[in-house]
């Protein structure tokens, strides 16, 4: 198994309300799970292949809860990646070179039965985790925006976090509001729903905890 590790930042938007039951081992509140995710790798490697500064994204659709399977997915890889980097990123994203179920990549890959061909393209993605703002734009495929949750009375920004001491994706996530719309082989659309902003530190064995 080739060892990999990276630090980065993510924005994830799904169909759930702001709390996202899935983070607490409960069933999705809409009965299905349709997420869009973008990740900026600040620094990382897969074996001797550097991954610094590259971006990846994905769209998923599960007809029920994630663990029930039968998912559909499409992966997007930064067109700036060379052949070695593309191969490395796809291995990470599909749960290869990873302990069983140690990362969200490995968990999700095990529940997807219809994986579309990956797309190598320009990924316009930026995210401010602490500020709870971000956007993802992939031409002809997907648009996602994220912002802070607003207090329903005062209109002021509201901040909440989810802490998962034994999670497989992040240690702490800031929660905001996000909206997504996609076209192409995996179509989703939802507004003002669960937005997950997180700093990531992952490797072949799972979340790296200090």
Residues covered by each model-derived region:
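Aromatic- and glycine-enriched beta-alpha-beta binding-site module
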Residues: 31-102
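Short, surface-exposed loop and linker segments with low hydrophobicity and enrichment for Pro/Ser/Thr
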Residues: 23-32, 64-69, 119-137, 178-182
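Generic structural motif
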Residues: 19-21, 42-44, 61, 80, ...
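Low-complexity, flexible helical/coil segments
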Residues: 48-55, 75, 109-115, 163, ...
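Extended, charged low-complexity segments
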Residues: 144, 149-210
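Charged linear interaction tracts used for macromolecular binding and regulation
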Residues: 71, 75-156, 160
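N-terminal ordered "arm"
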Residues: 2-46
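Short acidic, gly/pro-rich beta-turn/loop elements at beta-sheet edges
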Residues: 26, 47-49, 85, 146-148, ...
């Amino acid at each position: 198994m080739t060892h990999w590790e990276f630090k980065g930042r993510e924005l994830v938007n799904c169909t759930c309300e702001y709390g996202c039951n899935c983070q607490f081992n409960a069933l999705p509140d809409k009965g299905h799970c349709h997420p869009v995710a973008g990740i900026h790798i600040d620094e990382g490697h897969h074996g001797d292949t550097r991954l610094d500064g590259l971006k990846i994204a994905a769209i998923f659709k599960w007809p029920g809860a994630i663990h029930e399977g039968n998912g559909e997915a499409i992966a997007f890889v930064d067109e700036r990646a060379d052949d070695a980097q593309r191969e490395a990123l796809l291995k990470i994203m599909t749960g290869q070179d990873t302990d069983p179920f140690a990362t969200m990549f490995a968990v999700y890959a095990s529940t997807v039965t219809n994986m579309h061909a990956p797309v190598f393209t320009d990924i316009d993605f930026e995210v401010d985790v602490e500020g709870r703002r971000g956007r993802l734009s992939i031409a002809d495929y997907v648009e996602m925006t994220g912002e802070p949750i607003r207090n329903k009375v005062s209109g002021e920004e509201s901040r909440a976090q989810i802490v998962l001491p034994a999670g497989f994706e992040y240690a702490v996530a800031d929660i905001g509001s996000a909206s997504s719309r996609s076209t192409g082989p995996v179509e989703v659309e939802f507004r003002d729903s669960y937005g997950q902003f997180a700093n990531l530190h992952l490797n072949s064995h799972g979340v790296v905890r200090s």
